[in-house]
Amino acid sequence: MRIVNAADPFSINDLGCGYGALLDYLDARGFKTDYTGIDVSPEMVRAAALRFEGRANADFICAARIDREADYSVASGIFNVRLKSLDTEWCAHIEATLDMLNAASRRGFSFNCLTSYSDASKMRDDLYYADPCALFDLCKRRYSKSVALLHDYGLYEFTILVRKAS
């Protein structure tokens, strides 16, 4: 979790939380968090709530929007499957979601996307491959001067970290 300061307790919104894998990751590394998982799938939210039943400082909500401000917000994997959406429609969806992540985050947010630098022979029509440079530019212009683009790990994806001024 390169977006957070691990030394201090923090609150976090996990948009597209699925069954709560990020909370497992945070717990395994000893992070002290107030966690809210948000997902559009009622089945995933139920599964996550059952997995973490009785756990303090962990809530799971079935929704498409974040309605709570936190120190950080993350979105992992939610921009990959576009089904039959046109590029223009999907780009507008991504931008609206980034606006929401920004509004819901006091200290910063992060997200990942499949990269347009993927091997053409492995690309699928139902997936969206974003231009990392375009999204980096958008984040620098719209959200913060402190933006990092991570495109140096073994997957055909990239991560953008947006840190807000303290």
Swiss-Prot record:
Q: Which UniProt keywords apply?
A: Lipid biosynthesis, Lipid metabolism, Methyltransferase, Transferase
Question: What SUPFAM superfamilies does this protein's entry cite?
Answer: S-adenosyl-L-methionine-dependent methyltransferases (SSF53335)
**Is Lipid metabolism tagged as a keyword?**
yes
Per the UniProt entry, what is one GO biological process?
A: glycolipid biosynthetic process
Question: Per the record, GO CC terms?
Answer: membrane
Q: Which GO terms describe its molecular function?
A: methyltransferase activity
Q: Which residues cross the membrane?
A: none
Any idea what a deletion of this gene does? Answer: Grows normally in liquid culture, traffics into host (human and mouse) acidified compartments early after phagocytosis, suggesting it no longer arrests phagosome maturation as well as wild-type, impaired growth in mouse macrophages. Decreased synthesis of 2,3-di-O-acyltrehaloses (DAT) and increased synthesis of sulfoglycolipids (SGL). Decreased colonization of mouse lung but not spleen 42 days after infection.
Matching entries from CDD domains are given as: AdoMet_MTases
Function of this protein?
Probably plays a role in host phagosome maturation arrest, as well as a role in the synthesis of acyltrehalose-containing glycolipids.
Q: Tell me which family the UniProt entry assigns to this protein.
A: Belongs to the methyltransferase superfamily.
Q: What is this protein called?
A: Putative methyltransferase Rv1506c
Q: Which organism is it from?
A: Mycobacterium tuberculosis (strain ATCC 25618 / H37Rv)
